[in-house]
């Protein structure tokens, strides 16, 4: 009964409002990575209430690096399929906004046209480099430049509930807590709806230190890819609002495809893989084949 009520609520509430409510809530929420329409459908069906449109995962699915090698129009096309296939909100990993304030505000306009609920922008220079690269030299944008980008995005959005998340890369660049707090406060004052505080340490000391000093000035989102052994109750205790499971569907696909391809290549047979892969009927179901059958009965 409760599950049906929640399903009805989420299907009738605007995606932007759904995402805003999740971010603003005192309860810790979780969103899961997807990188195309199929993975988005699986995330929604699993029960997640939101989707992370991962720049790394979308780029990887295209076979290119996470360095803005996929153009924003190519990313928008992927997002359109993801949005059409689901009723839950998508928060896009918008990198640096694909340029300056003008590129970023145009991105917001195009995202709203596709019913994307929000965008997360990071305070690095364009083109970006992935934050988890071992030898990646990270260059941060000047604070005033990124502040202007946030303001331009907020001024551009037509839906008041569209979310602009400011991702602070001070820890990633090795600039420390003081700089992280300085940037987060500037972005909050510029109108950012939430702060995504990123860290690539294997333990969460940087995030813990930030949360203690931040004192719930505005919602905080984290991405515990590297400090994944920390219990989520710890994040609740610190006052984190949202956790992003950022790239695991894409990585699961990579592992599964590598193993399946290797096995078929070595065996010259499907005998050992057929029991382990999804049935074709399951793929048809996820594609919505039943709806087409019903439509055929009605219109043909």
Curated annotation (Swiss-Prot):
Cystine connections: none
Record-linked InterPro entries:
ICL/PEPM, PEnolPyrv_PMutase_core, Pyrv/PenolPyrv_kinase-like_dom, Pyrv_kinase-like_dom_sf
Annotated catalysed reactions: phosphoenolpyruvate + H(+) = 3-phosphonopyruvate
Propeptide residues according to the Swiss-Prot or TrEMBL record: 1-10
Q: Which UniProt keywords apply?
A: Isomerase
Q: Which GO terms describe its biological process?
A: organic phosphonate biosynthetic process
Please name the top-level EC class of this enzyme. isomerase
The terms under GO molecular function for this entry are: phosphoenolpyruvate mutase activity
Record: active site: 66 (nucleophile)
What pathway is this protein a component of?
A: Phosphorus metabolism; phosphonate biosynthesis
According to UniProt, the name of this protein is Phosphoenolpyruvate phosphomutase
